[in-house]
Amino acid sequence: MPERNAVKILITVVAVAATLQLAATPFFGDDLAYMGVFSGPNAHCDSFFDWLLNGARHWLNVNGRLANILFTALLLLPKWLLACICGCFTALMYSETIKLSGLSKNFTSAAILAGVMLFALPWWDYMMLFDCQFNYVFSCGMCLWAFRKIYAKPKSKLHLAFLSFVCLACGMMHEAASFPLCIAVSLSIFLSGEKPNKVLFASFATGSLLVTFSPGIIMRALESGSKTPDDTPLMLLLKSDSAALIVAVGIIIAVIRGKFRSFAASKTGVLAIASVISMAIGSASGIIGRTGWFAQTYAFIVIFTFISPTISRTPKIITAALLATMLFHATAVVAWQRKLSGEYDTFEKAYAASSDGIVYGDFTKDNAAPIITLNKTRGVPDADDTYLLLCLAGQLGKKDFPPIVLPSEVKTAVTENFSGTVTLSNGDIITSTKPKDAKPLETGFFITHCSGTECVVQPFTLYGKKYYHISPRILDPGDR
């Protein structure tokens, strides 16, 4: 089989796995928040014109990302179809990354790059959200596609007009994806590098400026400056932008050796500089995780462009082992997500029928997922997942009664005359007295320590009396 065809099959398998996972993933968090635009108790759009107005408000008050605006309308589609669209996004991102690395005809190197993308990108940071699929996977693939196209020669004026429109849209997808590319391409032009098509680059740059300097993005940038960073600057970079840091070191070496000008004028140099700029934008947010998505992807292209002659000689048995691991990982993720989705459906139906928000059930905890899933799955939210719980409450019109999940044993452990403290069989504690050292963390729950373990204290009311459910806190990667 020609290696080009083998690479296409590899990309297809990755895309199918992503589609199956997303089809099994329930809507939650931001997905429900955006769904509320067209449905639910707070719906305020019921026409194309309303959607345009909502997009304008989003550009002014939230962010200027076209990915979000498009996503709002596409939520009207059946979930299976939306999952298929996102699977195509995944294929696009992988395909463009492999093409720009020059690996379309090198199956071994392409397989290793695909493995790095599957295991090293921050998929764990809520990438199972359809909203994040649009914001990061789709935006990344579209911006890389546009980067290739601005250096291509249109076949006709009509083709040029079509590409210009699409490049404008690509530039508006996400500021951390398009703006660094625009700066890097501009520098390349200044240094007498390969000239892009002026019309296509102008369209892409216009879209990028529209999102980067939208009022919503500017307000977000100002607000992020007042927030406490997730970690120190160095640790932020190491955790979110490790590959981009390697590229930054390479750029410094090129400067020292006097080769920066020629390097920056090349397409690989453009992506290297874009990676570092995107890294700076992401680190300025102070958030660990998906903020490094674009910087890392661009960095992978640069790194694999240089190392592909070496890794292409990787023994077939190692490549086969990598592919087997990738397949095992994808299968485990899909299987586990299907299990969690069944539990979530049970939880959501019980919550919708509940008059006080209380749901009894022994649902799978987030930390029970097999390591091989790499935190890419989601089920019933934990007690400290306040935002996820409130989004569900808002979409179901039950803001006054957000979900409170209690172990099934509470039904028999807490009777009408219960007072005091009882330890359940799973180790959780039910008490009628709030722990003295309990400190409020977010709306609706408190934090305490039990034998050195950080625990969530969740108040609930039964038989007209207030009780407290104390359980170990499970911090998910990506929690802010």
At which residue positions do the language-model features occur?
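Intrinsically disordered, polar/acidic, low-complexity terminal segments
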Residues: 4-60, 66, 72-92, 101-106, ...
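Membrane-interface micro-motifs in multi-pass membrane enzymes
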Residues: 61, 65, 108-151, 173-174, ...
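Hydrophobic, aromatic-rich transmembrane alpha-helices
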Residues: 90-99, 186-190, 243-265
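Transmembrane alpha-helix segments characteristic
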Residues: 110-118, 199-206, 260-283
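Membrane-interface transmembrane helices that cradle and orient dolichyl/undecaprenyl
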Residues: 143-160, 195
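Signature aromatic-anchored transmembrane alpha helix within multi-pass, membrane-resident enzymes
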Residues: 157-162, 202-205, 261, 309-332
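Membrane-interface alpha helices of multi-pass inner-membrane proteins
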Residues: 159-175, 181
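Perimembrane helix-loop-helix junctions
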Residues: 180-205
